[in-house]
Amino acid sequence: MVAEVDSMPAASSVKKPFVLRSKMGKWCRHCFPCCRGSGKSNVGTSGDQDDSTMKTLRSKMGKWCCHCFPCCRGSGKSNVGTSGDHDDSAMKTLRSKMGKWCCHCFPCCRGSGKSNVGAWGDYDDSAFVEPRYHVRREDLDKLHRAAWWGKVARKDLIVMLRDTDVNKQDKQKRTALHLASANGNSGVVKLLLDRRCQLNVLDNKKRTALTKAVQCQEDECALMLLEHGTDPNIPDEYGNTTLHYAIYNEDKLMAKALLLYGADIESKNKHGLTPLLLGVHEQKQQVVKFLIKKKANLNALDRYGRTALILAVCCGSASIVSLLLEQNIDVSSQDLSGQTAREYAVSSHHHVICQLLSDYKEKQMLKISSENSNPEQDLKLTSEEESQRFKGSENSQPEKMSQEPEINKDGDREVEEEMKKHESNNVGLLENLSNGVTAGNGDDGLIPQRKSRTPENQQFPDNESEEYHRICELVSDYKEKQMPKYSSENSNPEQDLKLTSEEESQRLKGSENGQPEKRSQEPEINKDGDRELENFMAIEEMKKHGSTHVGFPENLTNGATAGNGDDGLIPPRKSRTPESQQFPDTENEEYHSDEQNDTQKQFCEEQNTGILHDEILIHEEKQIEVVEKMNSELSLSCKKEKDFLHENSTLREEIAMLRLELDTMKHQSQLRKKKYLEDIESVKKKNDNLLKALQLNELTMDDDTAVLVIDNGSGMCKAGFAGDDAPRAVFPSIVGRPRQQGMMGGMHQKESYVGKEAQSKRGILTLKYPMEHGIITNWDDMEKIWHHTFYNELRVAPEEHPILLTEAPLNPKANREKMTQIMFETFNTPAMYVAIQAMLSLYTSGRTTGIVMDSGDGVTHTVPIYDGNALPHATLRLDLAGRELTDYLMKILTERGYRFTTMAEREIVRDIKEKLCYVALDFEQEMAMAASSSSLEKSYELPDGQVITIGNEWFRCPEALFQPCFLGMESCGIHETTFNSIMKSDVDIRKDLYTNTVLSGGTTMYPGMAHRMQKEIAALAPSMLKIRIIAPPKRKYSVWVGGSILASLSTFQQMWISKQEYDESGPSIVHRKCF
């Protein structure tokens, strides 16, 4: 990145500090704009540094120029200051300091993959590099190579799996399932899963096969592993789960499948990254959007306390930042260093992100302010206020208004200007009026009683009538303009009207009685109104008596000064004094003048009363109009309020309906989703059935398909493949369960043990045989034996092979149907066939006609067969076989002094019987020899080292087959049973039966059995008939060998029962096709 100067030492004298060099080599040219290729630095380009000592390296670092380190040079933000300011420290300390250079010196490398020396919270992606295995052929065995390459034929792979442990691990702890899953060999994965291999095995990096399948994007293998129950939440050595790798690969379908199978969406790796934080850190916008829809935690923190928003800002991804802001994420959260997302955006010069954060903050502030001023609450308050106002108007409760309408103020100003305008033209009359108004001593502005009469007060202008009319109009206009003002100041016009009427009535009453009323206080507006009314009344009186100039001012003055009351009316005069009146020269004239004045006075009072009444009515009408107008306005506002409330309730109902529709849509979507899932399941089942049908067709068309042959004996189970000479698996048909619960946690004690494993642990187990006398009595244990046969002994999948089963003659029909049902429904076999054991034994000897005496561990049968067909009416059954002989030997050994009581000890006695016992040709003679000599005695060493001696017991035990009375049974011996079976057959075939008597079963393996049978049957049969006893050397397995021969025939495919036939007819089809 940066070039070297001439002062750099030679390359041969340098040592390579490889960690620092690898970090320095990954810084990009954007962080070193001026030093790249220049002579200002001693450090060369990426990977081109020479080896030097620590001192030389520090001297180089000190010569980096200030242009490449604008803020750290000489500041406290970096531990690498100016040239020569370095401390002497080890390489480790220097590396730790270099990791602390601030983001201003490394603007583009911070938080990105270009540098390993970024911010203090950067992560490495070594866990996601090179997902596939590095495989060398010499490190893998045969099975692992087949699993990795997947180019092995299916048959060969099946054979390989049969002989190899499917869970075997190589040097790197990889199983075959790991390799097949990582390389996408779905066929091999399916075979391994069918063999029930272990699913959660970890390789050297603690990854399961599912983790490798997801990491390598092998979706088909991953889905198969999920369906078989692999845990998707097992972390590897980096702490990553399968969901982390799916998110890193931007595989939304796989991520969705993992979540459906229980993957933890909030799991964290060793860096504290959840799948969402990993997607943000790697700038995977689509999967981030997917995880947000899946309700991933947006406030999750990594190990440095950083949220998804801070990581998105550090990565410079404006699109992810915008996506997160749409989810109302907290933008004020801080990491462990105390920095917020905005501070990171500013320090990294991400202007677009800064703008996004600013816009988001403004929207949040607007949202908060709009929530504080809730329109619905304002509507409610407005409605309540209007209701209170309307209620207050009805209850006559006046309200105070903070402001008057501007028009009222303008009206007042106009009236005052008009009055001033007319004052200059009506000086004389207004002076008289003003003198009359202000002459009294009261301070209420009303007209007091006149004290003196002067000629100056009786002077009027010539144009009296014109002035009078002008003044009347002026006063009338002024009153009309003042009336709305008075009504606006009072919030209850009806009450004011009522009070005004009452006051006027009181005034009239007071004027009649000559008693004026006094008021303690009154608003200024009432005082002004009284003055105007008084002036108006004076003008009206002047109009009535316009011809007499003296009377008008006299009456006006007398009316104004008659009393000191504040009601504004004109009371009558109470007294006449000589000082206040001028009399004429003669007494008669004085009398007539006084009478005329009294009459005139009375008439004026009546006129004043009528005028006042008319004015009151006019005032009432105007007030009523004002009240009606206000009521109309109130009714209009109430109507608007009701309309608004109705509209609000309608909107609420619509919102409720929308919510109900939304809930209904959600419910319908859930039902559709459930239906889709059910459809998917049904389709999967149909596909599985089709696959099984295809497999069955392949098996039918392929002549080389191996048929499994299983001989279910009462004591031993023999199993193998058709065409083989001998069975591959022979084990006791026995199931053992622990007698007591295991006390040690590490013993891995099973619930049950089968076959040889059960026999080897018989000391701590309770052993049971699921078959008694050739009939299955415990189907659960029998199913365990079959499962053990398929998966542990033969290591095959039963759903891939047809099966031939054997059964004893005279088996109940219900047992056959149950056996058929288990094979098709539990083990999903494609086809099966059931054959009688005696017939298969005859096939082994190469005959189709003869009589088979089959004696095993639980039962003995004699079955006559002619041309391959058994004769059921001549078939006989004897419940005397090897198990009864074992019990008899235990009894006679106990009589000898040896104690055998438990099930485990019984197995020891069975081993003695099979190894030492034989059939005596002449039982009486043998008994005599044993009694006279000890040469017939034999020794047997028990498992504990004890040696027991056996005398005549070793031939007395098999003698019970010929003399059942030894066991307390009243039945015939095996020789008589064979003879009786022949005699029940047709006469024409008896000769063939005598000459083809075949011995079969493990109980017939005693030495001397064939000779004794020849002797006993010859003694019973007619002398002219030839008796021939056939005893094959491998008659212990003759039933299984006969089944192998039958299943290998080309016509066997036409004999078996297919899965399709079973589905159509049920278990009862076994009687029609097999018997």
Curated annotation (Swiss-Prot):
Keywords recorded for this protein, A-Z: ANK repeat, Coiled coil, Repeat
Cross-referenced CDD domains, in alphabetical order?
ASKHA_NBD_actin (cd10224)
Q: Name one GO biological process term.
A: cell motility
Q: Where is the composition biased (Basic and acidic residues)?
A: 377-392, 401-424, 466-483, 495-530
Pfam families on file:
Actin, Ank_2, CCDC144C
Cite a GO CC annotation.
Answer: actin cytoskeleton
> Keyword Cell wall biogenesis/degradation on this protein?
no
Region (Actin-like) residue spans: 703-1075
Q: Where is the composition biased (Polar residues)?
A: 485-494
The stretches annotated as ANK repeats are 172-201, 205-234, 238-267, 271-300, 304-333
Does this UniProt record's set of keywords contain S-adenosyl-L-methionine? Answer: no
Q: Which residues form a coiled coil?
A: 413-436, 642-698
Q: Where is this region: Disordered?
A: 369-530, 544-597
Source organism's superkingdom? Eukaryota
The molecular function GO annotations come to: protein kinase binding; structural constituent of postsynaptic actin cytoskeleton
Assigned protein family: In the N-terminal section; belongs to the POTE family.
Q: What is the protein name stated in its UniProt record? A: POTE ankyrin domain family member I
The organism encoding this protein is Homo sapiens (Human)
Name of the gene encoding the protein in the UniProt record: POTEI
